[in-house]
Amino acid sequence: MNNFKKVGLSALAGSLAAISANAAEMSVNGATMLTYTSEDNTETTGNPYGMKTNIGFTASGEVNGYTVSYMQTSKDQFAGMTSARMSIDMGDMGTLAFDQGSGSGLGTIDDKTPTAAEEIWDGLDGAGFTADSVGGLVGTAGASGVWNYVNTFEGVTFNGAIRKGSATKNADGASSGAGGSAWDFALTTDGSMIGVDGLAIGAGYGEDSGSTAAGVNEVDSTHMTAFANYSFGPATFGYQKSEINHGKQGTQSEETDAWGIAFNINENLSV
């Protein structure tokens, strides 16, 4: 839902860019969800009920002929910021953005298998897994402190991300500690290029240089993924394969094979 439409801002010099904007439009949106969570017999379930409460802000305006946009989303129960993004739409030259948590590059296709709602791993606690094993597997640049460039060429969308140092949501005037730089990209298109309606395909690759702290010598880790989804009538079928080759000694490479089927029964129900 959208509330408080057209909240006027006289200038966005500090919020959107280092140059002033004449006017912008801001909107507020929110989401809520009631959950019931039951743990297995090795864990304790006290009160199983929870509620998701998020609120977000978006704004856009014209700056020197370009469209400048900003978004920010709060964490659940308003416990700080979960993501923010400032972008400049340059028309045929593409879109350049600074991302702090919304998702860029390879991370935008970390899990493209069909679902009825959230991804199949949503809600898992990750016990017994590494940080990469549960949820979206790939994405070297991460989603915080990332420069993102998006453009479409001959029907193929390029989404690239690059990060200098650690993936940290720095406040204005701050910098992060030691951390490896990273870059990655995703290429996506549909079946129109090969004459197959309903087909969506994509692939991506990235590298992470590891830690740059004194006395630490790590080899680059590589991330890669590829997916294909096919929609026929109300049904969508999909498969995705992802792989991480860790450069750090003593770590194991990780692979994921995922498939999904989603079926739209009607406009109000999907399985």
Q: Where do the protein language model's features map onto the residues?
A:
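Outer-membrane beta-barrel proteins
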Residues: 1-271
